From Swiss-Prot:
Ubiquitinated. Targeted for degradation by the SCF(COI1) E3 ubiquitin ligase-proteasome pathway during jasmonate signaling in response to Pseudomonas syringae infection and the secreted type III effector HopBB1. Residues 54-101 have a biased composition (Low complexity). Interacts with DOF3.2. Interacts with SPY. Interacts with SRFR1. Interacts with GAI and RGL2. Interacts with DA1, DAR1 and DAR2. Interacts with the Pseudomonas syringae type III effector HopBB1. Interacts with SCE1. Interacts with MOS1. Associates with OR in the nucleus; this leads to the repression of its transactivation activity to inhibit chloroplast biogenesis in etiolated seedlings. Expressed in the vascular tissues of the embryo. Expressed in young proliferating tissues. One of its GO terms (molecular function) is sequence-specific DNA binding. This is Transcription factor TCP14. Disruption phenotype: Delayed germination. No visible phenotype under normal growth conditions, but the double mutant plants tcp14 and tcp15 exhibit reduction in inflorescence height and pedicel length. Residues 117-171 form the TCP domain.
Amino acid sequence: MQKPTSSILNVIMDGGDSVGGGGGDDHHRHLHHHHRPTFPFQLLGKHDPDDNHQQQPSPSSSSSLFSLHQHQQLSQSQPQSQSQKSQPQTTQKELLQTQEESAVVAAKKPPLKRASTKDRHTKVDGRGRRIRMPALCAARVFQLTRELGHKSDGETIEWLLQQAEPSVIAATGTGTIPANFTSLNISLRSSGSSMSLPSHFRSAASTFSPNNIFSPAMLQQQQQQQRGGGVGFHHPHLQGRAPTSSLFPGIDNFTPTTSFLNFHNPTKQEGDQDSEELNSEKKRRIQTTSDLHQQQQQHQHDQIGGYTLQSSNSGSTATAAAAQQIPGNFWMVAAAAAAGGGGGNNNQTGGLMTASIGTGGGGGEPVWTFPSINTAAAALYRSGVSGVPSGAVSSGLHFMNFAAPMAFLTGQQQLATTSNHEINEDSNNNEGGRSDGGGDHHNTQRHHHHQQQHHHNILSGLNQYGRQVSGDSQASGSLGGGDEEDQQD
């Protein structure tokens, strides 16, 4: 760029010289070259004020300078225009590049992290363990959740497990508590488990109904009873007979009786005593079987619903046969005869009943009680007849006072008539040898009539045939009196 500029300046300088002629001009030009050796650079620098005063440019030089300046502006404007044309293209490319880069950065940007990185899901049997069930089963669970008003389906399934806990225990014997439940950090909100949980677990919120005997306390009590030597059974738990078949074999075949429920709820020691007495009773029963067979031919024997009635014609107390039932039958044995010897008679009936207690001079009053049972049914009943000494009790039968009304089976009339016949029979045997005149006969008749009324009052409280029994007893009394008159004649 300097070479063209210098040539143009030289041309301009030559033109200036040709325009201004004369010797003075040459001398002035000589001086000018002497003072300004580098004329082209003078145009670019500043002019001194002395030079401006000394030399004034001509119009031709000013026009040449203007053309030079215009040429420089044109040469500078061309690359500027080219740069301005290329600038929009570069800006568009830069915008596209920035957009692409922003899209790539947005794609590579990681998602926002949670506040806590802890896994809130509990791992049960591995991380990928899930439950798959049929669609119908799932629909039923959802419907049950809506009907019960539960917050989640898991709560409904938990409720179903609670309801099925007895069946699960009966089928598996262990329940639904997993083997690794100690390692699981779970809180059983309302679990119906029958197993004891660690202290850091919450206790079961729901309890079983009283009819369900599979509660933890009941199972523990049953285990202690089994270790102690036997399983104690009490009648309040009869409501749960169906689920107890596995724990108590044979309980379905057991039929509780009134005597069992009222009189047999003893303690453990009393139960042991009763078992020993029953064993001794069985031995005595075997020994007296042959004797009973012979005595049955001589005595009237009527057995109604397990209650044995027997007369005392032989003059001694006969042992009553035990019915094959649960212990607790009522033993009714005739009193001792009046023709006793010097010593007292202690009569026992298989260890269950305490018979007559007597001192010197014959048999005493019969005492009826139950061993080791403190109930109202053990009240004593002593037969005392006015006009008859204590050593000569001629009563045929003695009944106990019962705490609860006892319903006889079929044949109540037969029981009443049989007892009355036995009373008359016993009185005839005892009083037949001692009747000397009509006065004794009337006294004996009055005594038997009074005793019959006494027994009729007891029977009327036990059954609904009191009136019929009373009529039959009066008839039997009249028959007994006729027989006695025949014997006296």
